[in-house]
């Protein structure tokens, strides 16, 4: 189910987009990954624990999720940032869509983000603490006073 969402970085820069997956706040260190394939492996890689992953490849979700390619039993990342999110996967190995996997694993995703611009910010200024959240559940003001402040987003 799609919903309005926002990405807010610790430096105050924000991006509005379309949310997918589980509707909750996802707070973590925003990083980027330049891989063209393997989003399932990246999401479940324990080395991404506590991080929000920005995929620089623009189209994510097209091969769905299978039960063989996980690096661990659960999604390690706190969130996912993409340019284009594929609603309907097409792959003979696919057992479920990426969105269904995100909901099952209670992970939020935001799409329709200018990931090239975001990646330049991260490259030039270094990783930033950020939060992805459904705009109907939080405002920026509430976000600064919530648990996200404990993660470094407070003013």
Locations of regions flagged by a protein language model:
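Conserved small/polar residues in nucleotide/adenosyl-binding loops
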Residues: 144-149
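Feature captures the catalytic cores and cofactor-binding loops of soluble hydro-lyases/lyases
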Residues: 4, 8-9, 13-140
């Amino acid at each position: 189910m799609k919903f309005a969402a926002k990405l807010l970085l610790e430096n105050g820069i924000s991006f509005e987009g379309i949310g997918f997956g589980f509707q909750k706040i996802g707070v973590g260190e925003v990083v980027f990954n330049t891989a063209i394939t393997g989003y399932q492996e990246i999401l479940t890689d324990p080395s991404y624990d506590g991080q929000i992953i920005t995929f620089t490849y623009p189209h994510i979700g097209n091969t769905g999720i299978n039960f063989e390619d996980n690096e661990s039993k659960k999604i390690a990342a706190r969130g996912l940032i993409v340019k284009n999110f594929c609603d309907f996967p097409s792959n003979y190995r696919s057992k479920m869509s990426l969105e269904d996997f995100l909901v099952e694993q209670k992970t939020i995703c935001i799409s329709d983000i200018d990931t090239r611009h975001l990646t330049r910010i991260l490259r030039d200024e270094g990783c930033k603490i950020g939060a992805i959240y459904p705009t109907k559940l939080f405002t920026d003001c509430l976000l600064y006073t919530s648990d996200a402040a404990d993660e470094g987003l407070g003013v």
